[in-house]
């Protein structure tokens, strides 16, 4: 039985029990223990870092941390917050330092708090079939197909105001032998469709719960969105026709727009204005109807930053969900450092740029009126690192990017987990120091922390960039699936 199905069965049983009690939760006190106070743990301190399982007392009540936290006052974070009340305790010492929580939910969770229907999406790159030797079959052999709900196929291009197929050989023509194919059947020379698309069709036949979404743009191909925004209806028409081409009609369940970045700078700079993104998404929704319309968006939580410029709040009504790219905050493009985590969950001491963390970005997006259930937390299946580093703690100087398999300064998790194992955590993510190199990346343990936080915020789930960075047994995909409600 699939792990996904098992979780859904458990969730369904829980839901049924909830209905039987008319939506109420009843707690019956044990007459033998109800009057016995729990021994108090050391008093909560606002300056101390707590991780999942740590305990603290506050105002005569014992609390247990569900995940990483600092500065969040017990008793103020609510049912879905970080602190779980264990009841009254015998004796409590008030903390010597107190402050308001640095990260509190800005709204009650609007997503499903436990139905097993959270989204676990991941990007599959078209070019990964070459140097990375990562194919659709790897999604099956790794066990990831059991846990994923959605695969984002990256990337289609945007040219002359239209959606276009990028690498036709990889997408529709590459012939697969029997041992390379998802179903063990070799492609023939005369079949009308081969390549990734045919393999994905086979994958969906084997795992019908998986949705496949075609993503357009990305860092390299976002330059064409400005022209597309000049005639959104024509753009939407071209995208719809491409996704429903007769050769692969039925493969794609919707479209994903990865515009980096509307009304801001990425590889190129866009000056379309704050309404352009909204107009584009509105046109796509009108054309695609009930099919998925999603977008990968910036996680720049700085004041006046990319979130403020993109128009994401007004566009939210037209999308099924946003995939918030909560990674790539810091890296060896600043070759001298300071070393800092590229995918921090929360703010941390010595943070080079305030607002470059997941919690701040999510809070800012919520403040725009975007429902929590329409926000997915981003997880990177890779690390970013420096070389020439002399200290293991974050904040050290460096001499340049650390060597990587495909690009300096970046390396897959599947390599780093053995090459440079994690030595500590900062801001809710892991870092590693080895042989003068300093890396930051997520591990199954930090993913557990992040997904617990995502659940507490009522987020719609999580997504990852990208599948080839995971281990051969899909350790990170599984960690996300296990962590989401």
Question: What is each PLM-predicted segment?
Answer:
Residues 7-12, 24-112:
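Tryptophan-rich substrate-binding surfaces of secreted polymer-degrading and adhesive proteins
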Residues 166-184, 262-411:
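Substrate-binding surface in catalytic domains of secreted glycosidases
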Residues 53, 151, 214, 257, ...:
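Conserved, mostly hydrophobic/aromatic
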Residues 239-271, 328:
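Active-site groove signature of glycoside hydrolases
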Residues 62, 129, 414-485:
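Extracellular low-complexity, Gly/Ser/Thr-rich intrinsically disordered linkers
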Residues 1-17:
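N-terminal export and membrane-targeting signals
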């Amino acid at each position: 039985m699939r792990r996904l199905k098992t979780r859904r069965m458990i969730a369904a049983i829980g839901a049924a029990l909830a209905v039987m009690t008319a939506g109420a939760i009843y707690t019956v006190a044990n007459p033998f223990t109800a009057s016995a106070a729990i021994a108090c743990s050391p008093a909560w301190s606002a300056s101390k870092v707590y991780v999942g399982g740590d305990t603290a007392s506050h105002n005569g009540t014992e609390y247990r941390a569900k995940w990483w936290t600092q500065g969040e006052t017990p008793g103020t974070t609510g049912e879905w917050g970080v602190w779980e009340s264990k009841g009254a305790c015998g004796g409590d010492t008030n903390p010597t330092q107190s402050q308001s929580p640095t990260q509190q939910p800005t709204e009650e969770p609007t997503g499903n708090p436990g139905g097993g229907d959270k989204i676990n999406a991941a990007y599959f790159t078209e070019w990964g079939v070459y140097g990375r030797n990562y194919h659709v079959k790897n999604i099956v052999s790794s066990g990831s197909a059991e846990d994923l709900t959605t695969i984002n196929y990256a990337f289609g291009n945007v040219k002359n105001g239209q959606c276009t197929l990028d690498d036709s050989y990889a997408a529709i023509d590459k012939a697969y032998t029997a041992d390379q194919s998802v179903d063990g059947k070799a492609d023939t020379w005369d079949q009308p469709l081969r390549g990734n698309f045919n393999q994905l069709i086979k994958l969906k036949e084997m795992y019908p719960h998986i949705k496949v979404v075609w993503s357009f743009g990305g860092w390299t191909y976002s330059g064409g969105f400005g022209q597309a925004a000049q005639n959104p209806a024509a753009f939407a028409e071209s995208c719809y026709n491409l996704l429903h081409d007769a050769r692969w009609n039925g493969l794609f369940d919707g479209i994903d727009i990865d515009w980096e970045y509307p009304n801001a700078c990425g590889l190129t700079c866009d000056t379309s204005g704050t309404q352009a993104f909204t107009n584009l998404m509105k046109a796509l929704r009108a054309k695609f109807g009930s099919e998925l319309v999603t977008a990968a968006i910036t996680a720049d939580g700085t004041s006046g930053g990319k979130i403020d410029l993109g128009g994401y709040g007004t566009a939210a009504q037209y999308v099924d969900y946003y995939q918030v790219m909560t990674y790539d905050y810091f890296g060896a493009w600043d070759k001298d450092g300071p070393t800092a985590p590229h995918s921090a969950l929360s703010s941390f001491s010595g943070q080079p740029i305030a607002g470059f963390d997941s919690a701040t970005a999510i809070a800012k997006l919520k403040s725009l009126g975007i429902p929590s259930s329409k926000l997915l937390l981003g997880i990177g299946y890779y690390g970013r690192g420096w070389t020439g580093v002399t200290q293991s703690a974050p904040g050290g100087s460096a001499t340049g990017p650390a060597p990587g398999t495909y690009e300096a300064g970046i390396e897959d998790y599947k390599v780093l987990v053995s090459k440079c194992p994690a030595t500590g955590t900062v801001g809710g993510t892991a870092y590693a120091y080895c042989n003068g190199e300093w890396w930051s990346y997520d591990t199954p343990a930090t993913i557990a922390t992040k997904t617990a936080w995502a659940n507490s915020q009522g987020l719609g789930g999580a997504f990852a960039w990208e599948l080839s960075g995971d281990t051969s047994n899909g350790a990170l995909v599984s960690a996300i699936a296990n962590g989401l409600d």
